């Protein structure tokens, strides 16, 4: 939600599938798969597209190596300055002042990301220059839509172990379903699903309208026109809950 991954993670997914099958899945094909709400992990999404295409499946660890080579173009745990992969092509969707504004509006914030920790830390700490941002990344909790990571983050951000308001901003059906599952797991809190279309779906296009309808049908409470629109929403949603507010971002 804070970076455009259409030219990085999604491109690595496409390239990985093409590497094994010779078939390059179209962006709409990936959107449709993500719309099922089950394929938040791009390694698993790559394997699923290969399975549906009828390609013999590689070992998962081999596919992960291929995917990581496309995405990082170097050792994920090494010097980011040496990375030559698609990660270098990730336009930011927000700047540091986005988080300052959330602070000013009375919202604590953190991140629940399906990205590998080196990727998440790179964008948060080096590109956005955030200092030790609260983060649940891949491997820290089960993959979404399991709500464990979101619940854990809310426990860190809210001043009380029960109660409070949590808004989660995401751009996939899995993100929306994570909020719905959190409501079941922790009914003592108010959980709000804010959703936004990924930037490769242009405003006014039929594809974007269809995608937003998927998010609504999945249970999103509000569709925002952009990530930055969350600032105005958070200003209008300040309030009265003395037990605190937490904004979690994909």
Where are these regions (language model features)?
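Acidic, Mg2+-coordinating phosphoryl-transfer loop and its flanking beta/alpha structural elements
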Residues: 168-222
